[in-house]
């Protein structure tokens, strides 16, 4: 550990194990760990190492909310967590998930926050004051009457945090809270958490795969191994400096500032002579008379890799869904392989295209992981031998073979994401669209996925890729399209984009680490 504590730990885990009844192996295995009330602790581990399960056990939701068994003990304030009256732990240990919508019950912001206070039996006469106070605290007072579904991802995450803060928790758990946020919303959310922590002295547990923007604030780094044991428990700086090989072996992303040599990936460049795969002409899309997409025009060639960037709520996901025919646009037209998109037979179109959703659960329709991957092949009349061979190959490539007979909805967040990508790769499609496919993924899986995408690109598949990861864009992508308030603000090489400071600021983007460090070195040299 990083510092001596004379006080009693807030949490004390003593050989604690948790196993889902549907699993043959424990998700958490004999963990012994002390967590202190005022510390900022980062929890890292490969996808499926038990991080989220541990968070839900600390919060008191598990094992009560699922079918699972525990061994050992979790003590909270020196008392076994199971001995507390129902609801006490949930109130004192707040949790914010990576998908804020999974926490919302109401339509309007004020009603959502009032619902929390009603459950705490707060008199109605006091509610308005408390709601305004917490919204003021997170900088969202002007949205008190807003519909939650109209808020951006960053704004929704702040409302989820406000719901937790209203309970005046003793401890806050953040389970990948910035995974879906644009670069500036991510920084703002982190700064908000740190400001709240300093003001209230509330302890925070941060579960993340990428901690470049968090680690400077943390007192402690705890790393769970792939076999669900504690591998590292010390200061982040010490761990990232001294244990890089160990962390890489455990598929942990090391913050870039600790890496001496940045890996260089050779980008796959499409042949300029390749035919056009997709054409978009003056596309407009409206929602309740509001223009979500305005006069969008661009084209994509076979074998081209385009990333679509923009702040939360800019229209990126809507554009992807229009491009694949999931949303019906109102003006303009889209041509795929020279033919109007709306004229294509849906079954034939699905053979040539693939779409990976932002939320993996939105595309699951089968009871087992194996059947989920095999589903498209069965629709396309593959032989049983072909289905078995191809499905097993994909499950191995995405490290899901050991989970092939599980229900997709019981997988970890990272495993669900890998499955959602695998289901789209039963053939080599002409066009693949990805909506933030790397969020929630460990470093190893992200690299594997990107290598697989580069292989598809080299075979002629056109790739359209939405992401908030600027380092990933800098490393892999040859062309960037920036959407701002529904319109195209930039279309060109990412290297050109990094030089346009005003545009980056307007669209809430950020230079990748490589560029930021280069600028710092130039400033130091000039001094």
Swiss-Prot record:
SMART domains tied to this protein: AAA
CDD domains the UniProt entry points to: ABC_cobalt_CbiO_domain1 (cd03225)
Keyword Nucleotide-binding: yes
Class of this enzyme: translocase
GO molecular function, one term: ATPase-coupled transmembrane transporter activity
Binding site for ATP 1: 45-52
GO cellular component: ATP-binding cassette (ABC) transporter complex
Membrane topology classification: Peripheral membrane protein
UniProt binding sites for ATP 2: 310-317
Keyword Nucleotide-binding: yes
Enzyme Commission numbers on file: 7.-.-.-
Pfam families: ABC_tran (PF00005)
Location relative to the cell: Cell membrane
Record's keyword terms, sorted: ATP-binding, Cell membrane, Membrane, Nucleotide-binding, Repeat, Translocase, Transport
InterPro entries reported for this sequence: AAA+_ATPase, ABC_transporter-like_ATP-bd, ABC_transporter-like_CS, ABC_transpr_CbiO/EcfA_su, ECF_ABC_transporter_ATP-bd, P-loop_NTPase
SUPFAM superfamilies given in the database record: P-loop containing nucleoside triphosphate hydrolases
Domain ABC transporter: 11-251, 278-510
Top-rank taxon: Bacteria
Family according to the record: Belongs to the ABC transporter superfamily.
NCBIfam families in the record: PRK13648.1
Protein function: Probably part of an ABC transporter complex. Responsible for energy coupling to the transport system.
Protein name: Putative ABC transporter ATP-binding protein OB0804
Organism of origin: Oceanobacillus iheyensis (strain DSM 14371 / CIP 107618 / JCM 11309 / KCTC 3954 / HTE831)
């Amino acid at each position: 550990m990083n510092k001596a504590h004379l006080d009693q730990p807030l949490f004390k885990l003593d050989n604690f194990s948790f196993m889902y009844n549907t699993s043959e192996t424990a998700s958490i295995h004999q963990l012994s760990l002390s967590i202190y009330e005022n510390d900022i602790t980062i929890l890292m581990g490969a996808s499926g190492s038990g991080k989220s399960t541990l968070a839900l056990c600390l919060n008191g939701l598990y094992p009560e909310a699922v079918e699972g068994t525990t061994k050992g003990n979790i003590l909270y304030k020196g008392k076994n967590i199971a001995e507390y009256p129902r609801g006490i732990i949930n109130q004192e240990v707040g949790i914010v998930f990576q998908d804020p919508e999974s926490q919302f019950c109401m339509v309007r912001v004020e009603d959502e926050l009032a619902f929390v206070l009603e459950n705490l039996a707060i008199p109605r006469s006091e509610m308005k004051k408390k709601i305004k106070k917490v919204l003021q605290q997170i900088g969202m007072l002007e949205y008190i009457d807003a519909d939650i579904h109209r808020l951006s991802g960053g704004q929704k995450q702040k409302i989820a945090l406000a719901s937790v803060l209203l309970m005046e928790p003793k401890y806050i758990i953040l389970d990948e809270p910035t995974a879906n946020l644009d670069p500036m919303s991510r920084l703002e959310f982190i700064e908000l958490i740190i400001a709240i922590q300093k003001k209230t002295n509330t302890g925070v547990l941060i579960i993340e795969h990428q901690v470049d923007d968090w680690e400077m604030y943390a007192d402690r780094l705890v790393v769970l191994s792939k076999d669900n044991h504690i591998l590292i428990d010390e200061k982040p700086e010490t761990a990232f400096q001294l244990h890089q090989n160990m962390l890489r072996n455990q598929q942990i992303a090391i913050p870039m500032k600790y890496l001496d040599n940045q890996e260089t990936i050779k980008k796959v460049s499409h042949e300029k002579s390749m035919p056009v795969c997709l054409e978009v002409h003056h596309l407009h899309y409206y929602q309740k008379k509001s223009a979500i997409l305005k006069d969008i025009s661009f084209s994509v060639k076979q074998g081209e890799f385009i990333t679509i960037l923009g702040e939360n709520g800019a229209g990126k996901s809507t554009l992807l869904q229009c491009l694949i025919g999931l949303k019906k646009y109102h003006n303009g037209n889209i041509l795929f392989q020279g033919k109007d998109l709306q004229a294509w037979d849906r079954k034939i179109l699905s053979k040539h295209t693939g779409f990976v959703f932002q939320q993996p659960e939105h595309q699951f329709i089968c009871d087992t992981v194996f059947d989920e991957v095999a589903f498209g092949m069965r629709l396309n009349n593959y032989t049983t031998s072909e289905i078995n061979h191809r499905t097993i190959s994909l499950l191995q490539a995405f490290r899901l073979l050991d989970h092939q007979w599980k229900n997709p909805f019981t997988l970890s967040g990272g495993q669900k994401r890998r499955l959602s990508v695998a289901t789209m790769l039963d053939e080599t499609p002409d066009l693949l669209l990805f909506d933030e496919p790397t969020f929630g993924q460990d470093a190893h899986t992200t690299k594997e996925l990107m290598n697989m995408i580069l292989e598809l690109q080299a075979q002629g598949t056109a790739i359209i890729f939405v992401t908030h990861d600027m380092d990933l864009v800098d490393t892999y992508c040859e062309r960037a399209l920036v959407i701002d308030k529904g319109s195209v603000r930039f279309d060109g090489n990412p290297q050109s984009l990094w030089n346009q400071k005003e545009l980056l600021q307007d669209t809430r983007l950020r230079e990748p680490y490589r560029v930021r460090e280069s600028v710092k070195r130039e400033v130091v040299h000039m001094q």
